[in-house]
Amino acid sequence: MDTFENLTLQKERYVSSAFIDSSLKMGIAQSVLMVQDNLTECFNQMGCDGIVYREKFNAFWVFTKTRVRFLRRPYWRESITARTFPIDNASFKAHINTEILDAQNKPLLLANQQACVLDLEKHRPLKISSLSYPKENFPSPVFDEPFENFHVDFGEENFQFEQIIRSQMIDMSHHMNNIEYIKLALNIFSDDFLQANEVDFLEVHYQGESKEGQVLRVYAKNIDGRFFIFIKEQERLVFEMTIAFK
């Protein structure tokens, strides 16, 4: 039986210029990037990251949902601490919490991610409980807001723009990178809007894969000040996001 002595990755980080937007604060998409990066390093620390799973199980991780609550976005050159840890092992899916804290140990950002594991050849889900992954003694969650189902209809009247997927938008999976979807969704807003409105929370669902050369169509709907953004490849929904501002 595999043993996991340390389930929490705590990393001292620094908000470098690579992580800020035009407000000189950590950007919205860049915040999710830091959460995702810390998760990857946490999995590496536990010996269950994508490299290990590919070699041992011919499998790979897929991150299906992310929800982030923004309390305060840190500024450029601010020192922060990022803590990431798994909170469960629910057979075919797992949830992982991240909290980002300021120098006074006050929370800046709280996040929960949902992930599953797929067989590399047939892309069928595998039981995480049967793999090398923690099964007990999980740390207490710091963020337990439930994921939502987006029951929102949209049509061509909600179309915003389209984007061809280029080579620099794909990653090691040879599919479009998760963060690139978020950046694309955020492009429905002007820079002036994002400067004037501070983000409260967002939730993203990665619904499918898309590849270089495909054309993505972006749709958006504002319902009582809350935005729902959908990205389609032809008739196939590949990404959806909701975002609210304070």
Task: Give the positions of each predicted feature.
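Small beta-barrel nucleic-acid-binding modules, principally OB-folds
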Residues: 58-73, 197-209
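HotDog/MaoC-like acyl-thioester-processing domains
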Residues: 2-11, 67-71, 75-151, 210-212, ...
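Hot-dog-fold acyl-thioester-processing enzymes
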Residues: 2-63, 110-112, 119-198
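Short coil-to-beta-strand transition motifs
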Residues: 78, 155-159, 215
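Structured core of small recognition/catalytic domains
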Residues: 175-246
